[in-house]
Amino acid sequence: MNRRKFLETVVAAGATLAASRVFAGPATSGMRSNFAFKKEDTPVILEVAISGSTTKKVNPAVPETAAELADEAIKCLDAGATIVHAHTNKPSDNVAKAVQAYVDAFTPVRKKHPHAILYPTANFDPAVYHKNRTVWPPEIQSGHYRPLAEAGLANMILLDTGVVPLAVYDKNGMIPQKGFWWYGFWPGDNKIVIDTCKELGCGTSISVFEPGWMKNVVAMARAGTLPRGSKLNIYFADYGFAGMAPPIPEALQLYLHMIEGLDLKWSVGLVAHDIMDTPLARMALERGGSFRVGLEDWGRGPSNLEQMERAKELINKVGRPIVTGAEAIKYLDIPFAATRPKA
């Protein structure tokens, strides 16, 4: 598509939007800041993201091999995790290789915990994305989900709908050339994920890095497009990190206002630091949400199990139960046949 035709498409889309007269409503006193619910009847979804980009060189507690990932996932599930998310850190433009890395890591977990909620990350390579200034096409970046679901291993997959820059500011307050890359998804990625969920019954973990990502979620929720078994992970980062809102109550309140009136399960997460050192973990618990922990988010922190134990202490103080196993699948309404509890 040439530039003129592209601009014509954008203008036409703008005209359609204007004609639809869909606008955000005003803020009200009935927002989720005053959200009332029975704590004992509203379970917490405790997700543990056991690995990310951090290596053993940075933190010896990080699991890296398939055997280590499997062992760590099993330990976290034994300790009461609702969901385990993992990165094998073996991305490949050969989708079969990317799939096999997760098969090796997830198979022992599925055998030990048949009702576990497990999901992989997208198939992406930051070094390649930095070099090429673009992402892999959808059939590569999201092509591993279906084979993992067909194998009965991943009963949840990632539904990411936008673009976010990932970098730490340098001493001049600039995004440095070295290490910068952008994490992003095309409509084709979303179609692959939603089609996989419709056909195989996977739930989705939906990342929200910016308000625009949440607008995508709201649009799909209103249209009835979100798959069953969906939950949101709303991410924050401090002022030293490019992208994402700071971890302050006002930022979370914005997101909660955006989803007001929608029946969505949601959690908060913090990039590169401890979510429990911010007001957001307790705020989420007191408003019916959850929060996630683990070495993907707080890569330099204590072990996954130690982060879990601290999280459980806070959850117990607030007075809400943690949902696990088959009950978690029913609570999230994940229709994935291989792990759906029998009636």
Show which residues each predicted segment covers.
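Active-site beta->alpha loop and helix N-cap motifs at the rims of alpha/beta catalytic domains
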Residues: 105-106, 110-184
